[in-house]
């Protein structure tokens, strides 16, 4: 979940996302199918005053962002966190993450920014002097861009004891086979590298130590393995699991919709619609294959078999509370708090008069009251990677491919002027056929950075390029001027931020060697 200096990952078509590898995604759509990332456009309408990166589909995907957007709309607590691995100068690719974090803070979220120095040391092998130098540069740029340090929190992994304690507790829930399956770790992987992963899981959940709340992690898609692992760990630490149930038999997540459909259709088969029997529902599903449209055959067969095995037991909706790892006192308190009809079993409780939402809220409240974390599974948003100015990937190891936030304005402008474009071979061909802004690193500069909040400018550049009215020379000149202006202002703001950083409780001189 950290941004480092490479911005490089394996493509989705390779069915591998490596947080420490290279970052070129050949088909972002494949991420939806392969990894369950959802399209951001599906939640865009629910986001108050969306950021330009959202409006322009640069933020293209999400996991569970609806709960964060709902918190914004309802003026409820939420948080945003991002980490930065200080392995080189911050560049314009990192600015995108800075902007996302700052925007969430401006929308009312509790904002957290961290320096992933333990990860940089263990996974990248940087010495502590290098880490200290780069950490300061990242923090100065973040503050210069508008991060409110009085309202947010900045920290280093290596000096945050609460974080380290949380990482230790989360490590109890993780095992080496998961590291192998998720990250490809093997027998030659350093233990410190594994430990840094658990620390990142703690980073992601750290904003909820004071109280559970929706939390969004803005990242590139290469960091999705971290997000998925953190969501799994958040669930494992919970005292209770709340599910929909219909009988004493347990149905899997993919089976419940079909059971719900059978219950809703009870008037078609039940002798007593107030008390449909499981065996009646099984017979109806077996005789009505259309009821299982969209459900794979194995799932439908499993549902029918389970219903048959339940026999004459009534098919009746309920909410089921499973005891995962609650203390005896917490489980007893939960039973006492459940209103209305309930049935208590060894390891779970069925409640017949609670909605699923009310049940989840109740389970969370009881857990927190009895010393549990109550973690809400973290959400995430995913942005596209910027193309390098030379046309390939953007990497700090290739100075010509990126613009550092520390570049002087003239150098930044020169890099833009030398950038690859999506233009045609000749001006005449460009006027006749139009350019290719979708394959142009210079247009990306406008869309990602230079147009700022001015959608009209980004749209104008795109349209003029595509229809042949804009030639690459003039477009580069305009972009170079805007880049120089941005860098000049940014570096002035960085200097002003030095006094702010000096007053913060964050140590930039590591005692480590």
UniProtKB/Swiss-Prot annotation:
Record bears the keyword NAD: no
Organism: Halobacterium salinarum (strain ATCC 700922 / JCM 11081 / NRC-1) (Halobacterium halobium)
Record's keyword annotation contains Protein biosynthesis: yes
Disulfide topology: none
Example GO molecular function: ATP binding
Motif window: 'KMSKS' region: 393-397
Keyword terms of this UniProt record: Aminoacyl-tRNA synthetase, ATP-binding, Cytoplasm, Ligase, Nucleotide-binding, Protein biosynthesis
GO biological process: tryptophanyl-tRNA aminoacylation
EC number(s) per entry: 6.1.1.2
InterPro entries named among the record's database cross-references: aa-tRNA-synth_Ic, Rossmann-like_a/b/a_fold, Trp-tRNA-ligase, Tryptophan-tRNA-ligase_arc
Protein name: Tryptophan--tRNA ligase 1
Family of this protein: Belongs to the class-I aminoacyl-tRNA synthetase family.
Motif 'HIGH' region boundaries: 86-94
């Amino acid at each position: 979940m950290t941004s480092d200096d490479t911005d490089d990952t394996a493509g989705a078509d390779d069915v591998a996302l490596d947080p420490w590898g290279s970052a070129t995604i050949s088909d972002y759509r494949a991420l939806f199918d392969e990894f369950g990332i959802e399209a951001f456009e599906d939640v865009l309408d629910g986001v108050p005053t969306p950021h330009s990166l959202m409006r322009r589909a640069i933020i293209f995907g999400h996991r569970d962002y609806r709960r964060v957007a709902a918190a914004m709309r309802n003026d409820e607590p939420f948080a945003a966190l991002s980490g930065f691995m200080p392995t080189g100068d911050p560049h314009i690719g990192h600015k995108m993450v800075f902007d996302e974090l700052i925007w969430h803070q401006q929308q009312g979220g509790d904002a957290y920014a961290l320096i992933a120095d333990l990860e940089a040391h263990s996974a990248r092998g940087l010495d502590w002097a290098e880490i200290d130098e780069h950490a300061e540069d990242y923090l100065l740029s973040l503050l210069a861009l508008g991060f409110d340090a009085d309202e947010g929190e900045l920290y280093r992994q290596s000096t945050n004891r609460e974080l380290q304690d949380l990482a230790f507790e989360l490590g109890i829930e993780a095992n080496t086979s998961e590291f192998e399956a998720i990250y490809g770790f093997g027998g030659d992987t350093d233990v410190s590298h594994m430990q840094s992963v658990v620390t990142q899981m703690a980073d992601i959940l750290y904003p909820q130590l004071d109280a559970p709340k929706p939390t969004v992690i803005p990242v590139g898609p290469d960091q999705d393995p971290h997000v998925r692992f953190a969501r799994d760990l958040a669930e494992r630490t919970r005292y209770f699991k709340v599910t929909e149930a219909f009988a004493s038999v347990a149905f899997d997540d993919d089976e419940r919709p079909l059971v719900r459909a059978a219950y809703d259709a009870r008037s078609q088969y039940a002798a007593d619609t107030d008390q449909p029997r499981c065996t009646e529902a099984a017979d109806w599903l077996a005789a009505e294959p259309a009821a299982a449209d969209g459900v794979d055959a194995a799932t439908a067969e499993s549902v029918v078999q389970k219903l048959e095995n339940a026999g004459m037991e009534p098919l009746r909706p309920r909410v089921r509370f499973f005891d995962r790892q609650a203390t005896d006192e917490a489980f007893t308190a939960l039973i006492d708090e459940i209103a209305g009809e309930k049935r208590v079993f060894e390891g779970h409780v069925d409640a017949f008069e609670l909605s699923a939402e009310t049940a989840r809220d109740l389970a969370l409240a009881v857990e927190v009251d009895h010393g549990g974390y109550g973690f809400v599974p973290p959400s995430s948003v995913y942005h596209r990677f910027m193309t390098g100015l030379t046309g390939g990937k953007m990497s700090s190891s290739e100075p010509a491919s990126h613009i550092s936030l520390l570049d002087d304005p003239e150098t930044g402008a020169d890099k833009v002027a030398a950038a690859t474009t999506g233009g045609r071979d000749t001006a005449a061909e460009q006027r006749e056929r139009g350019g290719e802004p979708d394959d142009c690193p210079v247009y990306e500069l406008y869309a990602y950075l230079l147009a700022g909040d001015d959608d009209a400018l980004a749209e104008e550049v795109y349209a003029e390029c595509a229809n042949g009215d804009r030639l690459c020379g003039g477009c580069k000149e305009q972009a170079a001027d805007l880049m120089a202006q941005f860098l000049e202002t940014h570096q002035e703001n960085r200097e002003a931020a030095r006094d702010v950083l000096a007053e913060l409780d964050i140590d930039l001189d590591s005692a480590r060697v």
